[in-house]
């Protein structure tokens, strides 16, 4: 929420107005029911892709754009609108991927750095990271 508090993002604006690296694909609801940050965070944005399978230790990791488009090495389908935004609750991991892209595009910073600056440090959390792959300094210690 810091980016909303700083007025860099709006909870109720069309996310496509701020997305740069990827756009929510055209769908039958674009004009009258846009996808919003509020909808993404409350799981009412009508976004598909409920979850992600994950990747093996030595498997290549996709970047965020590959995940959103559903292209290799991503192992999930493209993130799309499947129901009218605002019409129903449906958990969607894809919603959080869009929220991540929105933050990264708006702040022009990498997600792990943003989370460190906006969430972890203010909360006093020092032994956690959002970096992938996990840095060796953050791996289990004896």
Feature roles, as predicted:
Residues 7-8, 23, 69-72:
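Short, flexible coil/linker elements and helix-boundary hinge sites characteristic
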Residues 10-28, 122-123:
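Short, glycine/proline-biased beta-turn/loop segments that scaffold the active-site neighborhood
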Residues 1-15, 96-104:
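Active-site SXXK
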Residues 27-142:
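Short, surface-exposed loop or secondary-structure junction motifs
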Residues 2-5, 19, 41-45:
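Generic hydrophobic/packing signal
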């Amino acid at each position: 929420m810091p980016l909303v508090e700083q007025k860099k993002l709006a909870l109720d604006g069309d996310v496509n107005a701020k997305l740069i690296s990827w756009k929510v694909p055209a769908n039958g609801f674009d004009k009258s029911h846009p996808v919003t940050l509020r909808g993404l965070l409350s799981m009412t944005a009508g976004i598909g892709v409920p979850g992600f399978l994950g990747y093996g230790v030595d498997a290549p990791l996709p970047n965020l754009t590959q995940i959103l488009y559903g292209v290799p090495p991503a192992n999930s389908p493209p993130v799309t609108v499947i129901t009218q935004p605002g019409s129903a609750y449906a958990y969607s991991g894809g919603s959080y991927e869009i929220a991540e892209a929105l933050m990264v595009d708006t702040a022009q910073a990498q997600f792990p750095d943003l989370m460190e600056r906006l969430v972890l440090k203010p909360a006093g959390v020092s032994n956690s990271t959002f970096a992938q792959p996990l840095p060796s300094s953050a791996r289990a210690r004896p």
